[in-house]
Amino acid sequence: MVLIVALLVFFCFLTAVPAALDPKLTGTWATKSRKVVTGPAFYDPAEDRFQEPENTGISYSFTEDGYFEEAYFRAIPNPTKPSCASAMMQFQHGKYSVESNGSLVLTPFAVDGRQLISSPCKSEGSMYFRFNQTEVFKRYEVLTDPFHNVKRLNLYQFDGTPMNPMFLVFDPPQMLPTETLNPTAQASATGRSKAKRGLPYGSGMASSRNKRPSTQVGGLTDPDKWWWAGVMMTLVGGVAFLYSESPWKDW
């Protein structure tokens, strides 16, 4: 009995241990162009829209108390038609942890992630999604870059592939509030999988390329008017048929 109680206490202690954090990660990091930086200049949660930077790039921010934010702006080449390259913008934020094996795990707030894919040569123009994907980096390094003499962050994807190095641009970090920004009753899927759902874009970039004709109500396309017209035509046809078959039609 004593052994069981001891095991229960030990288990409770393990579950109460907070996730490991690394103060060396604190700050805002950006790739060499420094044109893509986390914060309100990249994604505006009030208007629910992206603001297109001058150049492509990646940015990550981390806080001392375990929160992260990411900003992606990438070009997607089209090998068969180079003039029809696409672009992708992506925002996520949430909590991070450093695992015992040295991996870095980013767990986003499921309802807040956004992704915009612009395809100028496709009829739909742009697609705007709610986006949720947990990210796992096999390892990371924080060091002083020998050439630029500034702090550099090296991230290695889950399979060990290195990402473009990022450099410290802000400390303390430049971020949006570390809380759910767009609460909704129906959260998108969680876990280490990607969940996309279409949603209206609002008033931001590429909205004019994704407009669809509105449906008229009250004109010829009103289904109620077509229904009543059908009823009247049926009645008229029925009366004409009865009259043609009646014995007094020749009187």
Curated annotation (Swiss-Prot):
<dbReference type="GO" id="GO:0006458">
    <property type="term" value="P:'de novo' protein folding"/>
</dbReference>
<keyword id="KW-0256">Endoplasmic reticulum</keyword>
<keyword id="KW-0325">Glycoprotein</keyword>
<feature type="glycosylation site" description="N-linked (GlcNAc...) asparagine">
    <location>
        <position position="101"/>
    </location>
</feature>
<dbReference type="GO" id="GO:0051082">
    <property type="term" value="F:unfolded protein binding"/>
</dbReference>
<keyword id="KW-0812">Transmembrane</keyword>
<feature type="glycosylation site" description="N-linked (GlcNAc...) asparagine">
    <location>
        <position position="132"/>
    </location>
</feature>
<keyword id="KW-0732">Signal</keyword>
<comment type="function">
    <text>Required for normal levels of the cell wall 1,6-beta-glucan. Involved in a protein folding machinery chaperoning proteins acting in various physiological processes including cell wall synthesis and lysis of autophagic bodies.</text>
</comment>
<dbReference type="GO" id="GO:0005789">
    <property type="term" value="C:endoplasmic reticulum membrane"/>
</dbReference>
<keyword id="KW-1133">Transmembrane helix</keyword>
<keyword id="KW-0472">Membrane</keyword>
<dbReference type="InterPro" id="IPR019623">
    <property type="entry name" value="Rot1"/>
</dbReference>
<dbReference type="Pfam" id="PF10681">
    <property type="entry name" value="Rot1"/>
</dbReference>
<protein>
    <recommendedName>
        <fullName>Protein ROT1</fullName>
    </recommendedName>
</protein>
<feature type="topological domain" description="Cytoplasmic">
    <location>
        <begin position="247"/>
        <end position="251"/>
    </location>
</feature>
<feature type="transmembrane region" description="Helical">
    <location>
        <begin position="226"/>
        <end position="246"/>
    </location>
</feature>
<comment type="similarity">
    <text>Belongs to the ROT1 family.</text>
</comment>
<feature type="topological domain" description="Lumenal">
    <location>
        <begin position="20"/>
        <end position="225"/>
    </location>
</feature>
<feature type="region of interest" description="Disordered">
    <location>
        <begin position="184"/>
        <end position="218"/>
    </location>
</feature>
<feature type="compositionally biased region" description="Polar residues">
    <location>
        <begin position="205"/>
        <end position="218"/>
    </location>
</feature>
<feature type="signal peptide">
    <location>
        <begin position="1"/>
        <end position="19"/>
    </location>
</feature>
